[in-house]
């Protein structure tokens, strides 16, 4: 006969299977750009997280290879990532996977290697976690394209799920913060205003370490208002962004 503990373990196992997420496509100024998987998104082969923060997969996940399409944008455009689990506009990510969302930018010529990334958006907790609001927004969150020099860039969206962040992956490989990462290829066609060079102060891997604030965190016991997301502050030249639905599937 199965007892309560057995059913609890089954529930945990099921949650771990159905919880994962990746980016399906993007919207530019409210217009959907079509299924972006392996088209303009450097899509991973599955929706599993990256947990080893020393891995090169921290840049653009495990399939960081150029794809055939680059999306044209201009400074000030609203660029919306749309995440999904198995099918577009499904459960997006498990409700238990609480954590922040960030977006970084780097020149495509770098392929994401080295200290080339600049954080241009971050949402952590404002009464509810960013991931909770992402589910309500049908997987959509927006970043405003900054006024940067014209050229090709990678836009890196990152979800850090903290439900197992009470242990470090380096010490307990079955646990650790789960990073869901996806990179889109963009071409900025507008010229920058003066003084808008990116800060380029972040490396993946490199910047996130076991001692970085936000990597080790007990989401069940600690005050969410005290949580500090990993990485630097958002770049001062970033115009902002939001977590809200811009369109329907």
Curated annotation (Swiss-Prot):
Its EC number is 1.14.99.56. Cu(2+) binds at residues 20, 97, 180. Keywords: Carbohydrate metabolism, Cellulose degradation, Copper, Disulfide bond, Metal-binding, Monooxygenase, Oxidoreductase, Polysaccharide degradation, Secreted, Signal. It comes from the Eukaryota. Lignocellulose is the most abundant polymeric composite on Earth and is a recalcitrant but promising renewable substrate for industrial biotechnology applications. Together with cellobiose dehydrogenases (CDHs) an enzymatic system capable of oxidative cellulose cleavage is formed, which increases the efficiency of cellulases and put LPMOs at focus of biofuel research. One of its GO terms (cellular component) is extracellular region. It is found in: Secreted. Residues 1-19 form the signal peptide. This is AA9 family lytic polysaccharide monooxygenase A. The gene is AA9A.
């Amino acid at each position: 006969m199965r007892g309560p503990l057995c059913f609890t373990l089954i529930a945990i196992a099921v949650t771990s299977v159905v919880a994962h997420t990746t980016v399906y496509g993007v919207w530019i100024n409210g217009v959907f750009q079509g299924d972006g998987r392996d088209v303009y998104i450097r899509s991973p082969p599955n929706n599993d997280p990256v947990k080893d923060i020393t891995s090169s997969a921290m840049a653009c996940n495990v399939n960081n290879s150029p794809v055939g399409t680059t999306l044209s944008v201009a400074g000030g455009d609203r660029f919306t990532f749309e995440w999904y689990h198995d099918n577009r506009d499904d459960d997006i990510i498990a409700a238990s996977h609480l954590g922040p969302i960030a977006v970084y930018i780097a020149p495509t010529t770098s392929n994401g290697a080295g200290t080339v990334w600049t954080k241009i958006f971050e949402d952590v907790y404002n009464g509810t976690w960013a991931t909770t609001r992402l589910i309500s927004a049908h997987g959509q969150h927006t970043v405003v394209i900054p006024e940067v020099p014209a050229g090709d860039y990678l836009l890196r969206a990152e979800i850090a799920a903290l439900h197992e962040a009470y242990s470090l992956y380096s010490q307990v490989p079955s646990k650790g913060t789960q990073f869901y990462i996806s990179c889109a290829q963009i071409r900025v066609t507008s010229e920058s205003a003066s003084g808008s060079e990116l800060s380029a102060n972040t490396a993946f891997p490199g910047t996130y370490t076991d001692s970085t604030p936000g990597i080790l965190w007990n989401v069940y016991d600690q005050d969410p208002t005290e949580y500090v997301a990993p990485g630097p502050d958002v770049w001062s030249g970033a115009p902002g962004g939001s977590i809200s639905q811009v369109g329907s599937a």
